[in-house]
Amino acid sequence: MKRRQFIGLIGGVTVVWPLAARAQQLERARRVGILMSTAETDPLEVASVQAFITELAKLGWGQGRNLDLSVRWGAVDSQRMKAEAEELVSLGMDVILAKGATVPSAHQATTTIPIVFVSLPDPIVEPLVGSFSHPVGNITGFTTYEYGLVGKRLSLLRDLSPRITRVLYLRSRQTGVATQSLLERVMESARAAGLSVTDAPAQNPADIDRAIQMFASSPDGGLLVAFDAFTGMHRQVIVEMASRYRLPAVYASRKSAGNDGLCSYGFDQDQQFREAASYVARLLSGSKPSDLPV
């Protein structure tokens, strides 16, 4: 497997060390793996990784100084995510940061290496942690808790276009316990609001185009975009299709709104990566995942 090492100089300072000091630095270096669910060609995802690295450096852990960072990209491919997670484990990481859809792969790959997750809808439903306040096992992190936001997004969609009676729910075709649970919440919230829902699982841009085009052929519709690796990777396509067919849309990710999407209601991914850096720093300093609440 081709290995990709994410090397960054934090602070812009290069120091020439004596050989003995270099050896000591290498001995003290800790290994942190970063497992991303999308592709390395996505500048907004790269920005989230950089936010994590920058924050970690502020906390005293810098690449090339006392830290060895490895980044792997899953490219919204479950088999690749699994392989990348297994490779990070084989390389002997001290801590793994895993995003969204990669978390189950990381969790399956190791029960001993501490894992910090980000952008995960519900680690209880998966199930991964057992308890928010006292996580069980080798994993903890930061959840987006999408369930509590569904009703807000539907309400916002109604505010954008009061005549809406139908909603197209666009999501990844990849299924899981959390995916199904979130779909049920969307259906329940929509019924309570007097809206009908068309579920649109997709696995490529053609699916997105087809689903939006067919749905937009009838009036009084709106688009609700799920927060997952697939919609994140193809957010520009989704934004363009919604605009082309004049479909009011609400996105779960702020990054989609930044791509000229009409409106979003969700968390700040870069900020969550910064917060995750504090957990990684504590784990590197000896804390256990069970000490760090979700």
Model-predicted segments: where are they?
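Short hydrophobic alpha-helices and adjacent helix-cap/hinge residues
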Residues: 1-294
